[in-house]
Amino acid sequence: MAILDGQTAFILGASAGIAQASARLLAADGARLFLLGRSSKRLDATRDRILEHVPGAEIHLHKGDPEDEATVKESAQAAFDVAGRLDIVVGTVATGGTGPLVHQDLATFTDHVMGNLRSNFLALRYGAPLMTDGGSIVFVSSTSAKIPMEGLGHYSAGKAALEMLIKVAASELGPKGIRVNAVRPGLTEAATTQGYIHLEELTSSFLERVPLGRLGVSDDIAPAIRYLAGPESSWMTGQSFAVDGGNEVRGAPRGPMFTV
């Protein structure tokens, strides 16, 4: 019997990247999946890719906005209703973008900060009450929550706020047997980094700050999410750890690397 057999995992923003890779690993260990995303086409592609690797996996799809309160509430309940339980919630929704803080207007700054909080808060708010037998909530933070990087002020502010939300939630929900943790990816090829990750000047300078000498990919991050979701991390809560090739050891590149 697989270690997650019988468990239900609700994954928000599940149509690509880190979420898709994490869903695949959860399914491989026996979890049934309930995937929420904005695009039916991309959700279908995610399902097909998972089934290529895990034939027979139980996968339920729900098209909707993972930043919309009614949608997340409805989806969390639907995930629970599949088998009368909700064991794992994975929140991956984020908003990228770059630019100096003094060039941001209030609306843009607010959108970027809340784009890294809104869906994750909703996942917590409506997922946790359905975890009646305890469970694990895992979020995707960022090394930007710990390392000041010029040009990522709005993004960093949102991720830093997420880190404190995780700590408070872990304290509040621990007595109910619900753990809340996060991974902090370094610079990773993902939807939120497509605007700049292939710029040679930026990546070459950034890689000087990465001891392992390469950018991340989704398959680097997913095993950490799988670990935090499963029983192997049963005595961990309120934590966040870096999967970053060692970037946090050396810190940010000098100068305005993310002002493109």
Task: List the predicted regions and their residue ranges.
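Conserved glycine-rich cofactor-binding loop
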Residues: 8, 15-16
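Substrate-binding pocket helix/loop in short-chain dehydrogenase/reductase
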Residues: 100-101, 105-113, 206
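Active-site helix of classical SDR
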Residues: 124, 158, 166
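Alpha-helical segment proximal to the catalytic Tyr-Lys
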Residues: 129-130, 171-172, 234
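Residue(s) in the substrate-gating loop at a strand-loop-helix junction
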Residues: 142
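Short, small/polar-rich loop/turn modules that mediate ligand/substrate recognition or access, typified
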Residues: 174, 179, 236-238
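Short C-terminal tail/terminal secondary-structure segment
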Residues: 226, 237-260
